[in-house]
């Protein structure tokens, strides 16, 4: 969006490491909720937040007469929808749509050569994103098969299913992606190897949380798509 229109951002690992946001006011720290007082002090014309996580703060601001916009980006289509909304809401913004279309070009393959991929977003407990998740939509877009597609079940996180040891043994992925394992990545992969005796070490890959599980930023999305395209 138009950088001159941006006056404040959350203080996250993404924004704190990006020089483009170095001079902007932080309205939150880490995973904490944004401060209504700090936001009001900036006198914004529009406050954009994540549907669900920021709902309470957005509701409070709306009651105080501040214009708000809640977005939910849990599928690729939702990202495209959000980009169209932002272009209409914020004047002098570059074409977000054109940038997004170049991040992760859609790829189509014949069913016979599509690679089956298991994504483990958590190791304890073991959780895997289903089709109705950001990760699932990326796999679809890149012509990859989600190894948990069609599996029933759920977890405490919407769009994810808990993977028991029995389920891990039953599915036959060709690639296993482990997201930001705590501790030693090598040990984590070694602990998973017995569940997939037909796979080699090179069939396991460590991926970042941002881009694959949480969209994060356009840069993190591009990196995740590039890594997935190499599978």
Protein language model annotation of sequence segments:
Residues 10, 135-159, 204-208:
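His/Asp/Glu-enriched short active-site or ligand-binding loop at hydrolase and phosphoryl-transfer sites
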Residues 35-49, 66, 162-181:
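Proline-aspartate-enriched helix->loop->beta-strand connector
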Residues 18, 58-85:
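Flexible loop/hinge segments that line or gate small-molecule binding clefts
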């Amino acid at each position: 969006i138009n950088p001159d229109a941006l006056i404040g951002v959350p203080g996250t690992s993404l924004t704190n490491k990006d020089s483009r946001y170095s001079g902007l006011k932080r309205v939150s720290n880490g995973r904490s909720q944004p401060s209504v007082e700090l936001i009001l002090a900036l006198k914004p014309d529009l406050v954009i937040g994540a549907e669900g996580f920021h709902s309470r703060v957005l509701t409070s601001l709306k009651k105080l007469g501040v214009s708000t916009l809640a977005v939910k980006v849990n599928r690729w289509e939702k990202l495209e929808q959000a980009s169209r909304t932002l272009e209409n809401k914020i004047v002098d913004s570059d074409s977000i749509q054109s940038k997004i279309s170049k991040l992760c070009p859609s790829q189509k393959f014949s069913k016979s050569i599509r690679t089956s991929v298991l994504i483990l977003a958590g190791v304890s407990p073991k959780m895997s994103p289903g089709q109705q998740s950001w990760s699932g939509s990326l796999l679809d877009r890149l012509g990859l098969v989600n190894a948990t597609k069609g599996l029933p079940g759920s977890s405490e996180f919407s769009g994810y299913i808990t993977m028991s040891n029995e389920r891990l043994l039953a599915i036959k992925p060709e690639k296993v992606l482990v997201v930001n394992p705590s501790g030693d990545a090598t040990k984590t992969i070694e602990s998973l190897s017995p569940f997939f005796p037909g796979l080699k070490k090179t069939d396991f890959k460590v991926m970042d949380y941002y881009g694959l599980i949480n969209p994060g930023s356009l840069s993190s999305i591009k990196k995740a798509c590039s890594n997935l395209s190499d599978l």
